[in-house]
């Protein structure tokens, strides 16, 4: 938000310097981002007069001028090529050494076609403050000679830019900024009253509102206007805040948008069809805005229509077909109250960024709907003339009045400062709050209409498990507490947060509390485990597209976001696998699937009807290696199962206690997936190939395997003091076996039997291959199993290795009936 010092003086009577104003703005929470004075770029430019002008002897298009430019430049010769240079003309003169911003040059004395030239006569475009280019600028005949041009043109007017937080829609107006400064001790706020203009005739146009996001709208016709350029003062004001002047009618609406924070719109009556304008829902149609862009509207969008069609996208941008121009004679002025959420949703979806949207989506002052129309009427009548109709309206102004209560002791107990009750009340009154009730301990205030962020009544939903009456009382208490905190914040920001003393937290115990919770510690452990297994960690939004969420099951309405940060992030995610799949798709499309980017994991929240849960999720796709130095191959579900098992074992779950059932969720391949359980009821995770339909919808091709660990459901291990592991100095020995197993044999049973063959030597057992077909009997599978043997005191001999191999073979045969493939 930008504003000039002269514009601020329209609302605030002050003597403070720019530096003092900026310091106070920062203290009261309106952070200053920059200060720019246009006069700083115009040092060296003077007002001057051409005393004499004659044609250059060697160039027909040049003139040699004698210029009077004040002290030190009483009689200067300047060679000028402007066609309008003539004797007696008052001009802008650039002295030698002056930087010309519009040309990016510095003026020097020199000769032009043999004639001395001691400066330059300039156009406004060359100064960087205008568009005209038909020669040099022509000043008034009353312009003094030798004065700084910036001072003469009233351009010595610093412009301050501040950052506005989303809750402070009232600070998107110069009056709102002035109000805060006055409350903060800078000057006195001037009263603002607008004239109520009586209508001369009934309005030929009427309003009708059918959209719930427009509770109240007013307007009036002004006929017989003359829409020409705005006066210089108005153009300078708009240019100072970065708004390009267009015409008087448009400039009035832009001026009041910045001055009062009151967006308005004007329609050319001659371009409208019918006698009624209706605020309604859009159909699936297109609309061309004043910016020339074509927008595709949705059924939730709010539009203003006449008999011919859409004339405005309400609260965002007017239509090209009904815009005013230099031929406009009759104009219809609109002032309305629109729902902030609806404006934000449509604006974000259509990527419309206007001053109107910026204010409506933060909430405007509902009490100024009529006053804004009256202010526009007065300005248009003064600048453009015309006759004014009576006001037409539709809907009703909502009851915006609400109260907030502040206990004075809370300034000490919560705010950390000791402020007298009278000073507290006085601070809030300066901000526009009115005391409705006061006792020795507390005061109740009527919240001003322009502060939509205080005691708004919007409270987060309570837990669904609460009794309805309990939830209602809880919400009421939360609302009252938030309103009190709002008032406390207002008092503290005027007091100055820098003045709040720093106080150490009380030490309640000698033994410090753990820095992390057990759940956080387990999440950190899983990150290390997954990284060690070659997966790369990602961090994704907890929001996903609704269509993506639907691929992973039902999409409850309770998980749909009413005000998403982006149109494709409108649903709480049911699983982090969605984010991983999208990231993996982008990585593989860039050829990053061979260096770890084809294997991703995330530890993050997921959401369902019962609430929020913490999950570990991982995906593998593309080529992956079983271990370093081994040829890469396409990811299989066994790697996903191994990842899942490694995570659970790291969390203290005995591998022998795990079992697999073939009832994984529907987003997995129905025949290549499973759930991992501890006992018959406790589901700890899932693994398998993603369903091909789901993978394709998420932009993936080929085999994609995934796994999830439900951290909330993994039991904490029993506290046992374990002996320190004995590390062997000897190399482990790996032996591969191929067992032929029948269709009813569980792979887990084979692995368990191999592991139990020799507890002293068998350190690990892993499945690395499954083969079907060939010479195998129908329905049978060949299971490739790697057994890792770890000797402790001496290296194993061939005889010992052969004995262990026979023990493994015998144990598997006895437990499962699987035989060694010959």
Swiss-Prot record:
Residues 728-821 form the FDX-ACB domain. Its cofactor is Mg(2+). Residues 399-502 form the B5 domain. Its EC number is 6.1.1.20. Residues 39-150 form the tRNA-binding domain. Signal peptide: none annotated. InterPro entries: aa-tRNA-synth_II/BPL/LPL, B3/B4_tRNA-bd, DNA-bd_dom_put_sf, Fdx_antiC-bd, Fdx_antiC-bd_sf, NA-bd_OB-fold, Phe-tRNA-ligase_IIc_bsu, Phe-tRNA-ligase_IIc_bsu_bact. Keywords: Aminoacyl-tRNA synthetase, ATP-binding, Cytoplasm, Ligase, Magnesium, Metal-binding, Nucleotide-binding, Protein biosynthesis, RNA-binding, tRNA-binding. SMART domains: B3_4 (SM00873), B5 (SM00874), FDX-ACB (SM00896). It is found in: Cytoplasm. Binds 2 magnesium ions per tetramer. Mg(2+) binds at residues 486, 489-490. GO terms for biological process: phenylalanyl-tRNA aminoacylation. It catalyses: tRNA(Phe) + L-phenylalanine + ATP = L-phenylalanyl-tRNA(Phe) + AMP + diphosphate + H(+). The keyword Ligase applies. It is an enzyme of class 6 (ligase). Its main location: cytoplasm. Tetramer of two alpha and two beta subunits. PANTHER family: PHENYLALANINE--TRNA LIGASE BETA SUBUNIT, PHENYLALANYL-TRNA SYNTHETASE BETA CHAIN AND LEUCINE-RICH REPEAT-CONTAINING PROTEIN 47. Belongs to the phenylalanyl-tRNA synthetase beta subunit family. Type 1 subfamily. This is Phenylalanine--tRNA ligase beta subunit. The gene is pheT.
